[in-house]
Amino acid sequence: MNNTPKSLRPQFLLNPDIVFLNHGSFGACPKPIFDEYQEWQRKLETRPVKFQAEEVFTHLENSRRALGEYINCDKDDLVYFPNPTHAISNLIPSLNLNERDEVLTTDQEYGACDRAWVYYAQKSGFKYIKSEIPLPITSVEEFCQQFWSKATPQTKYVYLSHITSSTALILPIDKIVKEAKVRRIKTIIDGAHVPGHIPLDIKAMDPDYYTGACHKWLCCPKGVSFLFVRKKLQEKMQPLVFSWGWGEKYNEFKASTQLHSESRFVNIFQWQGTRDMSAFLTVPASIEFQNQYDWDSVRSRCGEMVLDARNRITELTGLPKLCPDDWLGQMATILFPMDDTVAFKERLYDDHQIEISTMAHEGHTAFRISIQGYNSEADVDHLILTLKNLI
């Protein structure tokens, strides 16, 4: 099928009056996938009891199977969550960390998950230690050396992003996981921006825990994410919300329902009270949508557009790039010589209808552009012309 920006843009529900260069924040869902999402909701509302108490679990299993094939792991090592923030907040209490333990991370982590770690560190007494990653980054070796510089014999876990949210860096996770195994340290990876963005092979990477969002670059409806847990670690997992899939009476309950999974891990997290799980069921259709439109070529085109846009903007501003080209995918964070970050974002959106993500960085405004299949060269040209007028 034709996968040019001109043909893909009408497939999305995005406001045509907005130059949308912020896919990375919350994603955007194609119309066929959104239609499927609503069809699952209609099935739920047509037969609420039959669907919610019986049929949905087979559909969830099928969805997890498709996701497992896509990221190369066992479907029963996956559970769905609305977002990685939710997944990390569920995971941390199950680690049973105490005042003798340390968790090593970076200063590049996503703020919401970072807050969860800080809260539980204060509550349980473990140390949450951040390796400072100086920018610009120059090499993988430099990053790894800086990251491991704060590891100690008390480091029990490493937690870091596969792709950083604010700075859009693709971190050398395979090397970090490999070194962590040598040091006998368990790994927790936040891959919120990974599924549908860069290849993910869980078995090859072999992390202990991995969470990712499907509503970003895989283009599912909002609120579809997963948590992978290595099988031998699943018995330690406990949900924050306890419901029918948990406890000694589970087998008795299972015998009288269609709850069929043999995985305790799956059951304790699937049953979390009444909720609409329709979005979770769209994962197979989202994968198929991208296959139909040869999304590998879309990603390649978008990556080239990101690098070209970054080159043009840094030539305009004279400010340094934050990383080499091969650290980037379909996003890039770029410095801009304007002090007031809030005013910068407001002017772009209110005056020029450009949606991007902004942040402050060492006295400069920084902004992150995201290029998805529906973005055209004209979108980038409009951004750069606007930036020229703001300097």
PLM region descriptions:
Residues 1-391:
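Pyridoxal 5′-phosphate
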